[in-house]
Every structure is written in structure tokens, then in C-alpha cells.
Amino acid sequence: MAMRQYAAATAASSSFRARPRARPSCLPAAALPLAPCCGVAWSRASYRRASVRAMGAASSSSSSSSSSPSPQGQAQAQAQGKPNYSTSLTDEEWRKRLTKDQYYITRQKGTERAFTGEYWNTKTPGIYHCVCCDTPLFESSTKFDSGTGWPSYYQPIGDNVKCKLDMSIIFMPRTEVLCAVCDAHLGHVFDDGPRPTGKRYCINSASLKLKKTQ
């Protein structure tokens, strides 16, 4: 009897030691694979499949996954007599047209440091335009203090911005915000904003140009 109890206790102890530790993850809960059981550890294949599911989930939640200028934005640009900036200017021309910071943010998808941008705490009434093509993007009336150190808005102007899936950070799908006319990278949008939209358009100051209202 004592030997059987000892054998059972030893087996239980070995099973407990064989269980893998839980690994932290920044994937959405719906995209995670089922928790491992029976001593089966996480595998690279499991994480790869989870990443694919996460990409699919993020793609379905984005308003658009296309990186080309939207038809609405191009139509508006043509109506205003503006050229198709996304195809008419070369990378070298953009370098000459923009400052170093503006080029890094808008054409190379960079991110400025929090609390350093020109407009992160600006409360001046006006319209925020794209620094590359002058398209009006956000009204100051939709700007709010998000506490993040970047200019934040709960709503863009019409169809002047577009969104696409951003998987530049592994296991953390995000929604990139771009100018619909010239494809300039503006920032990212999140679902933790105020009413009435519940959105937070987190935008780089270097991608904007504020035109004050009289």
C-alpha cells in the first residue's frame, strides 16, 4: 500500500514539473492558440499560426487594407487641381520638399518621441492639413487630450484619411493612418477614444500643418 502511494505521488510530481510555464503574449485573446495541456509545450508552429490569425483579425477590423490612395481622396485632389502626389513625386523629390523630420515620419513611417511634437498640446482653433500635399485632415474641434504626448483626434475630415493593417511589430497588429491623397504616414488609430466615435487617431505632429481660423 505504501509503495503504491509513493509511486502515485512521484508520478504526480513529475507531471507537475513537466508543465510548461505560461508565456506572456501581446496577441488579442481571440487570436491565441488553445492553452497547452498534457505537458505539450508551445511550438513555433503554434505561434506562427497565432500570428496569422491575429493578422486576419486585425485586417477585418481595419477600414481598408489597401496602401494605394483612395478613390475619394484622389477625386477630391483632382477636383482641387492638385497632382497625384503618390505617383508624381520621386523619393528624392520628397527629400528635397520636406524637412528631415517630416520625411522620416511621412515617407519612412517613423514615429516622433512623445511630448516633443509641435502640436501635441496645441489648443489653437484651426484645420490640420497634410504637410506633404496640404489636404485637410483634422479639425481642431475633434482634438482631445489623450495624455499620450501625441496629437489625438476622434474623427478625421471626410474620407481624407485611410487605414491599413500594420504588422511592423510582431504579434501586435495595429491600424496605420495615412493621407488618402499622397499616402503620407500620419500615425495609428485605436479603439479607446471618446464619444461620439470611440476612436483615437494618434498622429505625429511632423505630418501636420495647422492653419489657424480667423
Curated annotation (Swiss-Prot):
Residues 1-53 form a transit peptide. Residues 58-91 are annotated as: Disordered. One of its GO terms (biological process) is response to oxidative stress. Its EC number is 1.8.4.12. Residues 91-213 form the MsrB domain. The keyword ATP-binding does not apply. Zn(2+) binds at residues 130, 133, 179, 182. It is an enzyme of class 1 (oxidoreductase). It is found in: Plastid, Chloroplast. Expressed in leaves and flowers. It catalyses: L-methionyl-[protein] + [thioredoxin]-disulfide + H2O = L-methionyl-(R)-S-oxide-[protein] + [thioredoxin]-dithiol. Induction: By salt, mannitol, cold, methyl viologen and abscisic acid (ABA). Residues 58-81 have a biased composition (Low complexity). The keyword Zinc applies. PANTHER family: METHIONINE SULFOXIDE REDUCTASE (PTHR10173), METHIONINE-R-SULFOXIDE REDUCTASE B1 (PTHR10173:SF52). Belongs to the MsrB Met sulfoxide reductase family. This is Peptide methionine sulfoxide reductase B1, chloroplastic. It comes from Oryza sativa subsp. japonica (Rice).
